[in-house]
């Protein structure tokens, strides 16, 4: 793994040397280091949205017995095969059979058993006639229509046969998987653990949302945005609060989150006199992997490790922080939780306006995706400043402009990373 690591000379950084790697290279370095966490035993309801860490095989057939798919009458098909409305067949009803009970009687020629949905098929019967095709006459019933032989009977093992693998290790547990687990009698299952993610925002100018907003101060929105992004992934955020621009305060706050599986810092990662995060992390034993990424927004994104713990340093600007999280931290957390699909979907969309940029960095431009007659279109949200949080509120995707591209004209196709897709018909 060490061949992927690129250690940075912090003294050179302080002198102004800037080393940037590509987005793809940064992601490769991160994901080569990230490994799935261990697993834990949870109840099946607690498993919703989690990734299962074991194969599940059926211990028995489902359904375990042939049973009725309809309310109606269990009969011998030979008795009723010629039944019509004009020439109904009259049978003697020998029993009423609710679901959950097994009949001790046998259906003989000329007889029927009234049966409820889910009730086991009684001996002698080979077909169920639905109630709508009958006329009840007390202890007799008239059959007005002959269904096909074997109709309305669910066979034993029709859903699942004993020994079948019904859920595979690595599958995401949705409500339907939980229903299947319940039907198999599994009250508890093993799932991948959810990472604890420590989040620290730094800056003398920051105050919390419930504090007095004095002149020159700003509310630390990143504390909540990042925590929400972590929760949306299914991981567990640990908010360490706000640290002042002093190495001792930053180091003290970071040490409180050392038990976490992942550490995220926001701000204090650029090259400057008041950027103390890198020094505090170095004192905690972090090895730096990279310090700058050739992307916009999000250039001052860092990645390192403290032992086997990944450490991400994000920019302080709200949009830069969110975009960097989407590109690097979200797939990392999903991989740690055992997910097979760790990336947002990327679609082709037709651009509705010209986009210009300087070549050299990959741009992630906030966009609004629409679907018109099965074709995707995208337009920007407007001004793209890295502090304009409202642009992320408007956006449902990120327009990806490659490093070597300087102009994309309206009408051309472009790749767009889908952030929110409920109205687009895109699988996330």
Predicted regions and their residues:
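Helix-rich terminal scaffold detector
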Residues: 7-12, 16-19, 23, 187-314, ...
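Flexible glycine/proline-rich
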Residues: 21, 39-49, 53-54, 100, ...
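Short, low-complexity N-terminal leaders and the immediately following helix N-cap/first helix
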Residues: 3-87, 114, 334, 339-364, ...
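Generic structural signal for well-ordered, non-membrane alpha-helical segments
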Residues: 19-23, 27, 40, 44, ...
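Solvent-exposed alpha-helices and their adjacent loops that cap or buttress functional pockets
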Residues: 66-68, 83-86, 104-108, 121-123, ...
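Short, glycine/charged-enriched hinge/interface segments at domain edges or termini
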Residues: 21-23, 73-239, 382, 418-420, ...
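Generic secondary-structure signature for well-ordered alpha-helical cores
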Residues: 28-39, 53, 57, 148, ...
């Amino acid at each position: 793994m060490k061949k992927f690591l690129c250690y940075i000379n912090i003294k050179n950084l302080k002198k102004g040397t800037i080393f940037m790697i590509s987005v793809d290279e940064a992601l490769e370095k991160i994901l080569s280091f990230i490994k799935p966490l261990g697993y834990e035993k949870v109840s099946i309801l607690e498993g919703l949205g989690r990734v299962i860490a074991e194969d599940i095989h059926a211990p028995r057939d489902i359904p375990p017995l042939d049973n009725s798919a309809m309310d109606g009458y269990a009969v011998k098909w030979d008795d009723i095969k010629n039944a019509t409305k004009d020439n109904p067949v009259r049978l003697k009803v020998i029993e009423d059979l609710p679901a959950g009970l097994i009949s001790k009687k046998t259906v003989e020629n000329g007889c029927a058993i009234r049966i409820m949905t889910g009730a086991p098929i009684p001996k002698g019967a080979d077909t169920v006639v639905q109630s709508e095709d009958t006329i009840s006459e007390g202890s007799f019933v008239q059959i007005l229509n002959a269904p096909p032989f074997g109709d309305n009977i669910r066979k034993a093992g029709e859903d699942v046969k004993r020994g079948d693998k019904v859920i595979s290790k690595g599958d995401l547990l949705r409500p339907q998987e939980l229903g299947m687990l319940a039907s198999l009698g599994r009250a508890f299952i093993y799932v991948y653990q959810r990472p604890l993610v420590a989040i620290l925002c730094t800056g003398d100018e920051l105050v919390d949302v419930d504090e007095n907003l004095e002149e020159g101060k700003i509310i630390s929105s990143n504390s909540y945005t990042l925590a929400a992004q972590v929760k949306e992934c299914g991981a567990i955020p640990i908010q360490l609060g706000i640290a002042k621009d002093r190495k001792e305060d930053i180091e003290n706050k970071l040490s409180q989150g050392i038990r976490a599986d992942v550490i995220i810092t926001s701000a204090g990662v650029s090259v400057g006199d008041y950027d103390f995060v890198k020094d505090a992390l170095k004192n905690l034993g972090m090895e730096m992997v990279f310090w700058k990424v050739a992307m916009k927004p999000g250039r001052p994104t860092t990645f390192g490790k403290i032992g086997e713990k990944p450490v991400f340093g994000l920019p302080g600007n709200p949009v830069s922080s969110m975009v960097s999280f989407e590109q690097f931290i979200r797939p990392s957390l999903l991989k740690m939780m055992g997910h097979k699909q760790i990336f947002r979907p990327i679609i082709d969309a037709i651009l509705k306006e010209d986009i210009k940029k300087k070549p050299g960095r990959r741009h992630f431009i906030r966009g609004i995706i629409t679907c018109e007659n099965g074709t995707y279109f995208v337009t920007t949200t407007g001004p793209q400043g890295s502090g304009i949080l409202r642009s992320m509120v408007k956006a449902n995707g990120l327009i990806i402009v490659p490093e070597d591209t300087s102009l994309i004209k309206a009408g051309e196709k472009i790749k767009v990373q889908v952030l929110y897709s409920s109205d687009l018909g895109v699988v996330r």
